[in-house]
């Protein structure tokens, strides 16, 4: 729960879901859907209804404890920030919200962008055009740093003569999403190697 100001100056407690949705929409518009909303300032909020301990250099805080159990929270540091990257997925590939959202966006975009391809004649040119359109989209996402890479292909084992005769054509694609730097570790090493540079 979060506190915000009412028009009359009083404070109102509200659930954070609308603020988080707004933060995600703002992040999508300003940075891209592939960025994590974690560590971003939530606007229009005075403070969390229940303070959560947090320090940038202390892993043993309430905020980090909650994050270990896939619970995002809010912390106070130069504003009220959403703190937490993780989903409740049991499959570790989908543990980060930004990775899940990237996959969803790619899948939805491909379906919408290929409405033109439904009910077209399945020819070699058709298969090549669809494959190249998907690959062009994946290259564009890579150029934007939305993904690290990806590729589309038509698998001949699935696209049998019978499948094509039944009006089915299969396009596989893969991609790698960038993962958020949830834990940054700086390791300090005191050495005498640079003493020689004094003279």
Task: Place the predicted regions along the sequence by residue.
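Short, surface-exposed charged micro-motifs
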Residues: 65, 72-74, 151, 161, ...
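C-terminal edge-of-domain segments
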Residues: 159-199
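A glycine- and small-residue-enriched flexible loop/hinge signal that marks low-structured segments
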Residues: 1-112, 155
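Helix N-cap and loop-to-helix transition residues
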Residues: 58-59, 123, 160
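Acidic, low-complexity glycine/serine/threonine-rich segments
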Residues: 95-157
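A generic structural signal for short, non-catalytic loop/turn and secondary-structure boundary residues
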Residues: 68, 145-147, 164-166
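Generic alpha-helical propensity signal that fires on short helical segments
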Residues: 36-42, 51-53, 124, 170-172, ...
């Amino acid at each position: 729960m979060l506190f915000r100001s009412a028009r009359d100056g009083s404070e109102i407690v509200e659930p954070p879901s609308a603020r988080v949705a707004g933060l995600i929409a703002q992040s999508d518009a300003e940075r891209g859907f592939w960025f994590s909303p974690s560590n971003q300032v939530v606007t229009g909020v005075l403070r969390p209804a229940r303070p959560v301990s947090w320090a940038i250099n202390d892993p043993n805080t309430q905020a980090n404890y909650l994050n270990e159990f896939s619970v995002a929270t809010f912390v106070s540091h130069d504003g009220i920030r959403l703190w937490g990257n993780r989903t409740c997925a049991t499959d570790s590939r989908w543990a980060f919200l930004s990775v899940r959202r990237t996959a969803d966006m790619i899948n939805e975009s491909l379906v919408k962008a290929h409405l033109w391809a439904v009910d077209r004649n399945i020819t070699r040119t058709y298969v090549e055009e669809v494959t190249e359109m998907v690959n062009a989209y994946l290259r564009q996402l890579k150029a934007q740093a939305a993904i690290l890479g990806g590729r589309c292909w038509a698998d001949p084992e699935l696209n049998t003569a019978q499948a094509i005769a039944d009006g089915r054509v299969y396009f596989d694609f893969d991609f790698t999403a960038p993962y958020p730097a949830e834990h940054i570790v700086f390791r300090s090493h005191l050495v005498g190697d640079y003493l020689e540079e004094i003279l």
